[in-house]
Amino acid sequence: MSTNSSIQPVSPESELLSNTTCQLEEDLSISFSIIFMTVGILSNSLAIAILMKAYQRFRQKYKSSFLLLASALVITDFFGHLINGTIAVFVYASDKDWIYFDKSNILCSIFGICMVFSGLCPLFLGSLMAIERCIGVTKPIFHSTKITTKHVKMMLSGVCFFAVFVALLPILGHRDYKIQASRTWCFYKTDEIKDWEDRFYLLLFAFLGLLALGISFVCNAITGISLLKVKFRSQQHRQGRSHHFEMVIQLLGIMCVSCICWSPFLVTMASIGMNIQDFKDSCERTLFTLRMATWNQILDPWVYILLRKAVLRNLYVCTRRCCGVHVISLHVWELSSIKDSLKVAAISDLPVTEKVTQQTST
């Protein structure tokens, strides 16, 4: 009787724990989390500073929409990394004793919501950036006249609100986020799934993530093919494509990083949701795919840091010098963004502005 009475007060909280466990190297996990969070915060902070400076420079120009979305993506990565990393370090510092420091499951719910949001929102933003560039390259006049910064901000808000809604679905459905087998993170229920609703959350998360990656791939492929066709057909607008190529290269970098980092975790969640694999047999593998997914938040900002026009230009010069080729004048990279976009978009507003300037000068 005394044994039963001592267990009963703990049982409500223990129901939130996974019934399986993962063997982890404690010291390695703690140091990994601290170093990982520090590097991620510094990387995203540097990328935010670069993108904000570029956005202020091109605020009324052709790159403003792209830079706005890119800044939102990096800011999302920054706060997701900061919040999730802080909670993870706290959990390790508390010896992963969830029953002691989170009896009401509030911290686990916050952790789970942040995990889902910081996972889906960057993928959505990456696909939205790919769509924006695809329209900008294939339909430049429509993009220049119809898609304004106000519209981009509305789409950005819609994407963020949708990601928040998906993250809040279990709470709205009176379900709890579960402490996973490693006791270091919270997510949807992944072991001993018997309810269709628990499967639905996993499959919805995996489907939305894979759909975002698929949209990014298709749009980036269309954009790249369109630019290559213009390049081989005519050299008339070669000067107007430098910024297009810069943004497309960055998008391709984001897409590759997202696919490599997120695909294993999304496929694993889909497999668990469809009961193809048992979570008990893949606990360590699931934790490994989760760490791969979180690497996306570190690598994303370096795409913008390293794949900028200035860096690519210097890399181009160094490569040609190393190959013993005479360095030609890179006038493609030297035109302003507004002139480039006007040439590509074929908007003939220049005569009107010239008339106005002539009238004012006289």
Swiss-Prot record:
Q: Which residues lie on this side of the membrane: Extracellular?
A: 1-31, 91-109, 176-198, 268-285
* Any single GO BP term: adenylate cyclase-activating G protein-coupled receptor signaling pathway
What SUPFAM superfamilies does this protein map onto?
A: Family A G protein-coupled receptor-like
One term under GO cellular component: plasma membrane
Report keywords, A-Z. Answer: Cell membrane, Disulfide bond, G-protein coupled receptor, Glycoprotein, Membrane, Receptor, Transducer, Transmembrane, Transmembrane helix
Q: What Pfam families does UniProt report for this protein, alphabetically? A: 7tm_1
Instruction: Give the superkingdom in one word.
Output: Eukaryota
Task: Please state the protein's primary subcellular location.
Answer: membrane
- Kindly list the places in or outside the cell where this protein is found, as annotated in its UniProt entry: Cell membrane
Summary of the function given for this chain in its UniProt record: Receptor for prostaglandin F2-alpha (PGF2-alpha). The activity of this receptor is mediated by G proteins which activate a phosphatidylinositol-calcium second messenger system. Initiates luteolysis in the corpus luteum.
Could you tell me what this protein is called? Prostaglandin F2-alpha receptor
